[in-house]
C-alpha cells in the first residue's frame, strides 16, 4: 500500500476559502505520499515520543473521517474553537467548522500534548512558516532536512509531519513499519509493556482508536475482540499467535 498521508487540502470551490464543513469528502482527506512540488519537502518533523507521534496521526485520521470539518483559510481557527471543548478530540466535533493544513496539524499537536498557548498567537494557529520553529522550541521533536527524509518515503514513520515551508504541511498516517517491538506472543487483559503498545498500534492500523499506552485494559480487550470477530477468529480477547498473524505481526 505504501505511505499514506492525511491533510487539509482545498475547499469545495478548489480555492482557499469555502463553506464550513467538508462539502466534497475530500477537503480534509487521506492520499498517497508524494514529493511536494514534484521535488521535495522542506523538512520532516518527528516527535521523539512515539506515543505523541501516534496521537498526532490519530487526530488527523479522525479529522479526515469527520465531514463536519472542512477547509477554508478565512475560518481556519473554527476547528480549534470546537475541538477545544473536547480536549482537542476532533472526532467529537458536531458543529460544521473549518481548518487549513497548518491549523489542522496545530490542533493535532495539541491533542498530542503540546499546549495550545505554544501553538497559537492571539487565537491564530501556527502557519506553515511558524510551525517548524514553534515545534522545535518545545524540545519534543527532531527535524530532518536531508533528501533521505524529504524526498523519499522509506524512512518515514507514523506521525511524522512533512512541511513545505510557506506552502503546505501533511501528516504521515500509515507506513509499512511499527515503531514498537513485539517481545511476547501471548497478551491479555492486565498485560503491560512495549508488546502491548505493538498490538495497540497494529489495532489502530486496522481501524481501532486506542491510546497507545502499553496497558492492556478493557478498551484494548474490546478492540481485540472486535478484530477477532471481523477476522473469523475465536473471540476471547486474548492475543496469541493466530491473532498476531491476522494483525500482520509476522510479515
Give the positions of each predicted feature.
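Short, structured beta-strand/loop micro-motifs enriched in basic residues and often containing a Trp
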Residues: 136-148
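Hydrophobic (often cysteine-bearing) scaffold residues that line and stabilize catalytic clefts
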Residues: 97-101, 192-195, 199, 220
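Acidic, Ser/Thr/Pro/Gly-enriched interdomain connector segments
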Residues: 178-214
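Loop/turn positions that initiate beta-strands
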Residues: 158-160
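Short, well-ordered loop/turn sites that connect or cap secondary structure elements
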Residues: 150, 155-156
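Conserved hydrophobic/aromatic packing and binding residues within compact polymer-binding modules
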Residues: 224-227
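N-terminal capping segments
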Residues: 1-120, 165-168, 176-182
Amino acid at each position: 500500500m505504501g505511505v499514506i498521508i492525511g491533510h487539509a487540502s482545498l475547499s469545495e470551490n478548489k480555492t482557499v476559502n469555502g463553506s464550513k464543513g467538508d462539502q466534497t469528502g475530500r477537503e480534509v482527506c487521506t492520499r498517497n505520499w508524494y514529493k511536494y512540488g514534484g521535488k521535495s519537502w522542506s523538512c520532516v518533523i518527528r516527535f521523539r515520543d512515539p506515543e505523541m507521534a501516534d496521537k498526532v496521526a490519530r487526530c488527523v485520521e479522525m479529522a479526515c473521517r469527520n465531514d463536519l470539518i472542512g477547509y477554508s483559510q478565512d475560518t481556519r481557527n473554527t476547528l480549534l474553537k470546537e475541538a477545544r471543548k473536547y480536549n482537542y478530540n476532533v472526532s467529537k466535533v458536531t458543529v460544521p467548522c473549518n481548518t487549513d493544513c497548518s491549523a489542522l496539524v496545530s490542533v493535532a499537536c495539541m491533542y498530542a500534548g503540546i499546549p495550545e498557548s505554544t501553538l497559537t498567537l492571539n487565537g491564530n494557529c501556527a502557519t506553515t512558516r511558524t510551525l517548524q520553529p514553534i515545534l522545535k522550541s518545545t524540545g519534543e521533536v527532531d527535524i530532518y532536512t536531508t533528501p533521505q527524509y524529504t524526498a523519499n518515503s522509506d524512512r518515514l514513520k507514523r506521525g511524522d509531519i512533512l512541511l513545505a515551508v510557506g506552502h503546505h504541511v501533511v501528516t504521515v498516517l500509515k507506513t509499512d513499519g511499527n515503531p514498537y517491538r513485539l517481545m511476547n506472543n501471548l497478551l491479555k487483559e492486565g498485560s503491560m509493556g512495549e508488546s502491548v503498545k505493538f498490538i495497540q498500534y497494529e489495532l489502530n492500523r486496522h481501524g481501532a482508536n486506542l491510546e497507545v499506552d502499553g496497558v492492556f485494559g478493557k478498551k484494548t480487550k474490546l478492540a481485540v475482540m472486535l478484530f477477532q470477530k471481523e477476522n473469523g477468529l475465536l473471540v476471547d480477547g486474548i492475543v496469541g499467535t493466530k491473532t498476531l498473524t491476522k494483525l500482520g505481526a509476522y510479515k
